[in-house]
Amino acid sequence: MSAQTGSTNVSADKGKGKSVAEPQDVTMGEGEDSSSEDDVRSQGLKTAAREHYLTTYIAEEVEEEASDNEIDKSNIIQGRRTRGKKIDFAAAAKDLPAEDDEDEDDDFQSEGEDDDEMGGN
């Protein structure tokens, strides 16, 4: 019987059920010295000072960005949009210089040429 009791305890720990939380000591102020409280206060002050600095710095940065938003009108290029326009690509192709395709074809080998060289027949 004792062997069965030990195995049931082990199988109970392996289930999917909720586990029972271990009790924690929640006493406040007993046995603590004042130096740890001072450390907590100083950390809180440091954190507050850091947050204040970051908030101030970010606010100044946003104000600078707001003043940079003005657009210089001389940088705007007019007449280059093609939305809604009909483009005659045939006429545009006539205006372009003829391309020299001979240079691209010099290194091209067709599949038939490779077969003749490899076969040796």
From Swiss-Prot:
It holds the Pfam family CHZ. The gene is chz1. Forms a heterotrimer with H2A.Z-H2B, stabilizing the association of the histone dimer. Also, with a lower affinity, forms a heterotrimer with H2A-H2B. Residues 98-121 have a biased composition (Acidic residues). Keywords: Chaperone, Nucleus. Forms a chaperone-bound H2A.Z-H2B complex that acts as a source for SWR1 complex-dependent H2A to H2A.Z histone replacement in chromatin. Its main location: nucleus. The keyword Protease does not apply. GO terms for cellular component: nucleus. This is Histone H2A.Z-specific chaperone chz1. Residues 1-45, 62-121 are annotated as: Disordered. Belongs to the CHZ1 family. It is found in: Nucleus. Residues 1-11 have a biased composition (Polar residues). It comes from the Eukaryota. InterPro entries: Histone_chaperone_domain_CHZ. It comes from Sclerotinia sclerotiorum (strain ATCC 18683 / 1980 / Ss-1).
